[in-house]
Amino acid sequence: MAHLLFLPILQLLLLYCTKSAQAQLNISIGSSLTPQGVNNSWISPSADFAFGFLAVDGNSSSYLLAVWFNKIADKTVVWYARTSSNGKDDTIPVQVQSGSVLKLADGALSLRDPSGNEVWNPQVTDVGYARMLDTGNFRLLGTDGATKWESFGDPSDTILPTQVLSLGTALHSRLLATDYSNGRFQLKVQRDGNLVMYPDAVPSGYLYDPYWASNTVDNGSQLVFNETGRIYFTIINGSQVNITSAGVDSMGDFFHRATLDTDGVFRQYVYPKNIHARPLWPEQWTAVDVLPENICQSIQTMVGSGACGFNSYCTIDGTKNTTSCLCPQNYKFIDDKRKYKGCRPDFEPQNCDLDETTAMLQYDMAPIDRVDWPLSDYEQYNPIDQTECRRLCVTDCFCAVAVFDKASSTCWKKRFPLSNGKMDVNVPRTVLIKVPRSTNSPSVFSSGSSKWKEDQKYWILGSSLLFGSSVLVNFLLISVMLFGTYCSITSRKKTQLSQPSNNSGLPPKIFTYSELEKATGGFQEVLGTGASGVVYKGQLQDEFGTNIAVKKIEKLQQEAQKEFLVEVQTIGQTFHRNLVRLLGFCNEGTERLLVYEFMSNGSLNTFLFSDTHPHWSLRVQVALGVARGLLYLHEECNKQIIHCDMKPQNILLDDNFVAKISDFGLAKLLPVNQTQTNTGIRGTRGYVAPEWFKNIGITSKVDVYSFGVILLELVCCRKNVELEVLDEEQTILTYWANDCYKCGRIDLLVAGDDEAIFNIKKVERFVAVALWCLQEEPSMRPTMLKVTQMLDGAVQIPTPPDPSSYISSLA
């Protein structure tokens, strides 16, 4: 009876051993694969990799012959078969339909389509068997065990640990993530010993000027991705040039790969094999190093479009190591799925037959923040001011963009197509792009002159009639003209009182009080209350039903009545992605109202201090946005604006959680005792710079101090002052953060936040920047330009001194 009980166990053991043995067996002559059914791939012994047919983008009618990571849900492809295109040097991916067969027979491996036509073979004979190795390498071997062909020797866009690229080989990026055709970039191990990265003209394959090189001509040997995860280029004398510098994680715990991605960046990725063993790592591919660090800056060719397509610009998301291509205002992608094709205007091109006045009425020059197209110049002027630079472009039908450099008083005009576009925090020039003017907007170049010409036309017409008519008619005409002149002068005076001239963009719209009362439903829904008044939600009665936020200024100081229009003009001239846009205003009787775009996601105060902490990447995005908005206010707009009351309540979030600063430009309008109850300073407790309490001048550094507090709050997801914390040392965040930084325990600030812990180096950088912003002495604080550079990782950050170290010396 016992032997009967033991029999099933023995059978299971034999079955297990048989399957294990089969996993190690060679792929023998006569074996075959088909795209559909269970026999569609050959698996490596560990099942980490597979070779066979993979549906292209989930499309069951088209299959790729490939090698992929078999244990990862998205089956990440690391190699795919390619064949020459009509006898040309360039290659195309091998994609077949169901019914095709891959067969190892007669000493060769051959892929045939449903009609029996051969579509691919690796051009080797006398093959005895094949192997799919645990390294991800698919090999064909002779009967003697010698390698006849291997996928590692014919790379596509990816290399794996233990893979070596010898002289004359190259990686080709894909065209798109799901289009395996040769893309726009190559990484070549040249026969002259140099490792070079090139932009590639699609579809011709012409190589533009390189954007990175190892500079090892006559010395380089091979590109190595070794078994420990290091990637380096070997030199003939035995030395090595590191290609990536990432700290390598355990090969046992992570899958590794390095890919020349579709954006031209060579990235080294890791993926946790066991998410339970590595709980802090996301279950996805994470880039641990990139080359080059900034593709937008690296590519700049006289021929070709640059990193992105023509008329677009390139931007880097440092938090995710990703590259994006964007279209400027009033432009859209030619093909949304193939953004490398560039952008086109979504308006009619300027007609060269237009006279200057008509051109200025139909077109405007809109500023673009931190974007530049360094090439495409066709005209230069010097010396010149910005207004004239604008005029010269808007009246020139060939001009698409004008660039003005204030320091040198120089203007450049650029024409289509715009190339090498890039977004960069260090763009020192004002970039203006031509866009259509809305039909109801007055000219940016003083509407007065065109109105004067219009008046002159009617005066001339009137004079002609006057001399050619009877006395009675002349008398009536004179009466009408005198009355018209009186009305015109009266109207012009009213216009001058209610709307100052605007020379830098579309002016804010003038609303009547009744319009805003109707839009807000009688000022019913309160969005917030601040020092300058109450903010109400409203909706315009336009074709879009535009949601708005209406600020009713209730405590305007008497001497600021005349300043109101000047300040509105200043605010109305600010155009930036990270500033809440002023749509219009009301200056009727004693009523002073400002109309802003509505921010659907509310304030940073609500967003940050809720029960659920926002993701680290989103907090980073907000921090960078606020920094760039302040940089614009301090250094880039026509008239410097010091906010004086930076705090989370004055930072709003739009539909995409883009941070936008509100309430800027209002400091001059408010009595000093209205910006903070019971104090003689402007600002809010906890965010106020020390110099407010001293008899020294107030500069933009007060905003830098406030930003330092906000930055720490963003890092830690808590308020600066929390009286209910268990540890008394943590009550004031600025003090606690300084203590943690000095002790090397930054991790305590983000305890329980796995995403932040994973990015602890960036957390440390942000805390260091915040501590520099919080220096007691204003001159020790960085400018917002330096702050943005430090946050972006563009400059080294020296160790910040203790923020309170100056207190004793100032006492």
Swiss-Prot record:
Native organism: Oryza sativa subsp. japonica (Rice)
GO terms, biological process: defense response; response to other organism
Keyword Transferase: yes
Keyword ATP-binding: yes
Cysteine disulfide links: C296-C314, C308-C325, C327-C343, C389-C411, C393-C399
Ranges of the Extracellular topological domain: 24-464
The protein, known as: G-type lectin S-receptor-like serine/threonine-protein kinase LECRK3
UniProt-listed PROSITE patterns: BULB_LECTIN, PROTEIN_KINASE_ATP, PROTEIN_KINASE_DOM, PROTEIN_KINASE_ST
Coiled-coil ranges from the UniProt annotation: none
PAN domain sequence ranges: 352-430
Membrane topology: Single-pass type I membrane protein
Domain Protein kinase: start-end pairs: 521-795
Catalytic activity field: L-seryl-[protein] + ATP = O-phospho-L-seryl-[protein] + ADP + H(+); L-threonyl-[protein] + ATP = O-phospho-L-threonyl-[protein] + ADP + H(+)
